[in-house]
Curated annotation (Swiss-Prot):
The keyword DNA-binding does not apply. Its EC number is 4.2.1.20. It catalyses: (1S,2R)-1-C-(indol-3-yl)glycerol 3-phosphate + L-serine = D-glyceraldehyde 3-phosphate + L-tryptophan + H2O. Belongs to the TrpA family. GO terms for cellular component: cytosol. InterPro entries: Aldolase_TIM (IPR013785), RibuloseP-bd_barrel (IPR011060), Trp_synthase_alpha_AS (IPR018204), Trp_synthase_suA (IPR002028). Pathway: Amino-acid biosynthesis; L-tryptophan biosynthesis; L-tryptophan from chorismate: step 5/5. This is Tryptophan synthase alpha chain. The active site is at E45 (proton acceptor), D56 (proton acceptor). GO terms for molecular function: tryptophan synthase activity. GO terms for biological process: L-tryptophan biosynthetic process.
Length: 264
């Protein structure tokens, strides 16, 4: 099993696609993950569906709605995660999740089982890092060697970024634009300078996400970001083709290969 940090040991930017677990069903997600990894994913983000995904745009909200149309359980989430890990044990898996599903399961139980299923990192958009609850959770993650990946937005101050330094691990998820997730037509101005500043302060790889969907965008961003994160464009392929597993897997493989080939 490779660590997240080892994935960033080469000079090439890392492709990090995202899928919503359970969309359109759990078995299909193993096939989607396999296609994306074969297409060049270096890390895979797995979204845990939630009823109130405040940071997510319409594509991922609809994916969660489709996922939650089936019986939901963290047991099934962990089982599917383990299946993906067994197929590609060399690829680090990261959960992108809201805090409530983890809290409902019990944080100690979750961290133990997540680690055993192959999870190496967590991204939790609605968990502030400077609360007593977060500090206790971070201690549990550290004991299990699970990275906590912090989000930095265009509005995050330099002082707040500095305060993340002692707690952040794995990489920094840099949110490239204001608002929720979703595909956008242009790259935000000043993105390169901002990413370089965050990397200098925190001393971790910085990966860019939110709004990236095309190979032209990934080609440019990969020249200065350590990784490129793409979620909504991947989920749109699943939304439009998920009823035909073979066709959808082929389209995901082709898309991942195109993005990977564009990156520096």
């Amino acid at each position: 099993m490779n660590s997240i940090s080892s994935v960033f040991s080469s000079e090439q930017s890392v492709f990090i696609p995202y899928i919503s677990l359970g969309d359109p069903d759990y078995d299909s997600c193993v096939i989607w993950a396999d296609a994306l990894i074969r297409g060049g994913a270096g890390i895979l983000e797995l979204g845990i569906p939630f009823t109130d995904p405040v940071a997510d745009g319409p594509v991922i909200q609809k994916a969660f709605k489709r996922s939650l149309a089936h019986p939901f359980s963290m047991d099934k989430i962990l089982e599917v995660t383990s299946e993906i890990h067994k197929l590609h044990p060399q690829i680090p898996l990261v959960y992108l999740t809201y805090f409530n599903p983890l809290f409902s399961m019990g944080l100690e139980s979750f961290t133990e089982r997540a680690k055993n299923s192959g999870i190496q990192g967590l991204i939790i958009p609605d968990l502030p890092f400077d609360t007593p609850e977060a500090e206790e959770f971070f201690s549990q993650l550290e004991r299990k060697r699970i990275d906590f990946i912090h989000l930095v937005t265009p509005a995050t101050t330099e002082d707040r970024i500095r305060s993340m330094k002692s707690l952040a691990s794995g990489f920094i998820y840099y949110v490239t634009s204001y608002g929720v997730t979703g595909e956008r037509g242009s790259i935000a101005s000043g993105l390169e300078d901002r990413i370089r500043m965050v990397r200098k302060i925190v001393g971790l790889p910085v990966c860019a996400g939110f709004g990236i969907s095309t190979s032209d965008q990934s080609k440019v961003i990969s020249t200065y970001a350590d990784g490129v994160i793409i979620g909504s464009a991947v989920q749109r392929i699943i939304e439009e083709n998920g009823s035909d597993r073979n066709n959808c897997a082929d389209k995901l493989l082709a898309y991942a290969s195109e993005i990977r080939a564009s990156m520096r």
